[in-house]
Structure formats: C-alpha cells, structure tokens
Amino acid sequence: MTRRRWLAASVCAALSTLLASSAATCAARADAVQGSQAPQAPLLIDAYGDSTTLGITCHDGHCGPQSQNAVAYLQDALRAHHGDRVQVTNLGVGGTTATQLRDGTGNRRAGPSAGLPWRERLAASPARIVLINYGINEVMQNQTPEQFYTAETTLVKTARALGRQPVLQTSNPMPDNRLNARLAAMAAMTRRVAEEQQVPLVDQFAYISGLPDWKTLMSDGAHPKPQLYRLKAEQDYQVVEPLVRRKLDSMP
C-alpha cells in the first residue's frame, strides 16, 4: 500500500470512529431527554368530611351518594385546567364529625385507614392537600362550638406538622332556622381556626346563605341537590386551584 493510500485509509477509519461516537452520544442524550420527560406522579388531594362531602342527595324520601357531588365537580374542573396531573379522592363519610376524624372513631367501613387517628392516617397518605368539611353533624350530635373549634384546630395543626396543606370549608347552611342558627356558630368556629392558623378557607356557609332562594337548592334538611353541589365546587376551585398551581410548579 502506498503512503497516500495508507493516509486515506487512516482518515476514513478515524472518520468512521468519530461518526460512531457521535451517534452513540446523540442516542444517549435522546434517552436522557426521554427519561427526563417521564410522566410526573399526580398531585393528590384528599377531601375529608361528612355526607355533604360524600355527596348524598335525597329524592322522594330516598337518600344516597350521587356521582354529581362537589368533590367530583372539583376534580373535573382541576382536570380541565391541569389534565391528569391532579387527582382528588373523596373520603367523605356520612354522619361523622371532626372529632371522629381526629380520633379515628368514624365509620371503619369507609376504608382501611378510616379507623386510624388523624396523625397516623394522614402520615400514611401521599396527599399534599387536604380539604376538611364538617359542622352539620356537630349540630345534630349536640357538640358545642368550643368542642368543634378544638377538633378543627388539631386537624389543621397536625396536617401542617406533617407537611400537608389544609383547606378548611364551612358547611352549607340548613333550611331549618333553629338548626341553622346553631350551624352558624360552628361556621364561625371554622372561620376562627382559619384566621388563627392562617390557612385557606372556603366559606360555603356565607356564600350559599347569600344566594336568593338557596333553600330550593337543598334536597332535604342538610344535603344539596346536584346544582348546589356544582356551585360549592366552583367556590372550592377558586381557593384550591391556586394552591394546586403553586405545588405543581414546585414539583420536580
């Protein structure tokens, strides 16, 4: 082989090696980019509360949970804005109070963690935001506003200590004037806790009480019709969505 041919062969070999190396580097970078674009785990929100969280509606004397409830409507609204990056779980249990949630003495059939005290239950949950909606059963079970205040304060303090974002909700009003006056005192306690602990509040009691003919949107003495559940979800969304946006922006 002449020197010229040897040089040409050497150059070709070097170019082949360089091209192969460049191709491998590009492939590795493509794999890295693809890996960095893997789907994020969704931001989880847990909604705790009574039957108005669960979504009970009554018709012709028959009451039961409906798919058209405030939590479902909130999920739909968040999904429309953020896609599948947000997931809301309805953990409402009929007939329960904030004290029962705190102590883990609610309906154990509601799930494997329903019988756990609040701290243990929340520590086991991956949810980043927790919605808390109570007040009606406190009235029906003759609790005092002070007892309710103590329970909700503990729920909020524990949630924050565990790195969760609590959001308090006042109950929707009740058509019975006597019961509603007592419920107003419970709503005042929820507002007090929200102010003292500096946590977000959805004041459903005040909002719904200001609606004209709001009683026509109730299916019985405590539970909204689907139309009112949708209105409640709109109020929830105004408070919850900015929290969701900030948390999504901070997620890796």
Where are these regions (language model features)?
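Serine-esterase "nucleophile elbow" of acetyl-processing enzymes
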Residues: 28-92, 120-124
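Catalytic His-Asp segment of secreted/periplasmic serine-dependent ester chemistry enzymes
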Residues: 173-252
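Structural recognition of the beta-strand scaffold that forms the well-ordered cores
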Residues: 44-49, 53, 87-92, 128-134, ...
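N-terminal export leaders
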Residues: 3-8
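Bacterial N-terminal signal peptides
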Residues: 10-21
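Charged helix-capping and loop-helix junction motifs
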Residues: 145-153, 182-187
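Active-site segments of SGNH/GDSL-like serine hydrolases
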Residues: 131-137, 155-185
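Oxyanion-hole/transition-state-stabilizing segment in secreted/luminal serine hydrolases
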Residues: 54-60, 93, 100-149, 174
